[in-house]
Amino acid sequence: MPESKYRQQTIRAPRGTVLTAKSWLTEAPLRMLMNNLDPDVAENPHELVVYGGIGRAARNWECYDAIVDALTRLEADETLLIQSGKPVGVFKTHDNAPRVLIANSNLAPHWATWEHFNELDAKGLAMYGQMTAGSWIYIGSQGIVQGTYETFVEAGCQHYNGTLAGRWVLTAGLGGMGGAQPLAATLAGACSLTIECQQSRIDFRLRTRYVDEQAATLDDALARITRYTREGKAVSVALCANAADILPELVNRGVRPDLVTDQTSAHDPLHGYLPSGWRWEEYQKNAQSDPHGTMQAAKRSMAAHVRAMLAFSKMGVPTFDYGNNIRQMAKEMGVENAFDFPGFVPAYIRPLFCRGIGPFRWVALSGDPQDIYKTDAKVKEIVAEDKHLHHWLDMARERIHFQGLPARICWVGLEWRQKLGLAFNEMVRCGEVSAPIVIGRDHLDSGSVASPNRETEAMRDGSDAVSDWPLLNALLNTASGATWVSLHHGGGVGMGFSQHAGMVIVCDGTDEAAARIRRVLHNDPATGVMRHADAGYDLAVECAVEQGLNLPMVAATQGKG
């Protein structure tokens, strides 16, 4: 690995109200970049890796230093351009333009493969930004906890009469994304057994209370699960092992979980999925010396993993892909029926997307947890009738450990995002919170992604692969005045399989911020309603009508009906 990708340095975002940059609009991206590399947040901060295999915040340490310098100098009418983690230009724009525009990992379609990307990465010409790593709005595992919780709750409604009490979830992966699974299962009322091949990840999840217990052996794990489900307790158990070994063994034993999924980093066979029989150190070494052979070995293990998932599905166990592209990897290794079980979005989440509901998140730049608790109360006050959301916020406060700057996520839609943003901005203006708040979201949202094996799988009109939508989302957020906007490729499912956009907006308490918030936090979720209405989803059309969206072709179609 080039020296510039490794530095023994501890980075933490500044706290409080003293500015390093020239305004809060440039201080915010600076703090969030640093927060992504906080050792309590990032998986491997010394190599700039935030989460998801090799999802980085900056291309190398020289680029990181240059980004920090540029942000501290940036004027109120300038925009910094980031190309795959490298600051390439500062241009005069205007005070309502984004302060930062980011493009990460984008390749011309024919060349959008891991092989070509890895060549560019080795030459220092590219950076994998994942979704929120390179767009500087990662908040640790909390960022996916509620989405996973909502998925498990909906699965309980569909398959088990509305409750997961006395049930258990079998899954794997305790990295930045997968680490949310055991806590989400517990919050949804279920037990869980999560397989993870790195002891350090299990230790971190135990320390932060995302996992309750670790079992010493598979027999021990199953005994614990049997006891807890019989007692009706929701307890999460981790086992240090390889999922490609454990899932087939469970099938052979005739063990029957109640839900099966997976969140290993299968999207990246070179860095994210340990081949069966290998040690992690051996995997890292071979990734450098024999990348092709390493990828093939990882994908062979994924094939065994997916065959076991297919076997569970054939038993009648609800089984679903949680968006890591493991089915595609298995299919490439000859598992022709890999897609016989669905992805989580078409199975459980799409009705939410039709209403523009998705992972709305915010961060207290002050570093004071009390600011988040005050915003929690404000959300309850504004979204007064949503008791399910209130329950989530109560559980989040009780169980979720803040990583880095205090943050919160809650899934809300078009109807509420603008109202919440304006309320937060007013809290900053009147001093109810001690410093500005940034509002962002995952790129996994209703109108910001094209990913045929994940968010846009099995679209009603067959438009799964059409990536005009995330491009339009990024353009509209730029025109609307988001503080920073990002457009990435390959997040979640790997090179060649997705394109997606993100936005972040700062609530600094000013009237100008309020005007930007009105535009951005309406237009951003509205693109999700638009995208699904255009695809023919009645729920999205109804939402568009209720919210007064101007969708010419949808209106014309409705008129003909």
UniProtKB/Swiss-Prot annotation:
Reaction catalysed by this enzyme: 4-imidazolone-5-propanoate = trans-urocanate + H2O
UniProt-annotated catalytic positions: 410
Family of the protein in this entry: Belongs to the urocanase family.
Binding site for NAD(+): 52-53, 130, 176-178, 196, 201, 242-243, 263-267, 273-274, 322, 492
GO CC, alphabetical: cytoplasm
Database matches in Gene3D superfamilies: Urocanase like domains (3.40.50.10730), Urocanase superfamily (3.40.1770.10)
Pathway(s) annotated for this protein in UniProt: Amino-acid degradation; L-histidine degradation into L-glutamate; N-formimidoyl-L-glutamate from L-histidine: step 2/3
Protein source organism: Salmonella gallinarum (strain 287/91 / NCTC 13346)
EC number: 4.2.1.49
Family annotation (NCBIfam families): hutU, PRK05414.1
UniProt keyword Nucleus, yes or no: no
A GO biological process held by the record: L-histidine catabolic process to glutamate and formate
Keywords: Cytoplasm, Histidine metabolism, Lyase, NAD
Record localization: Cytoplasm
Cofactor binding description: Binds 1 NAD(+) per subunit.
Gene Ontology MF, one: urocanate hydratase activity
HAMAP family: HutU
Protein name: Urocanate hydratase
Lineage: Bacteria, Pseudomonadati, Pseudomonadota, Gammaproteobacteria, Enterobacterales
Annotated function: Catalyzes the conversion of urocanate to 4-imidazolone-5-propionate.
Top EC class, one word: lyase
Listed cofactors: NAD(+)
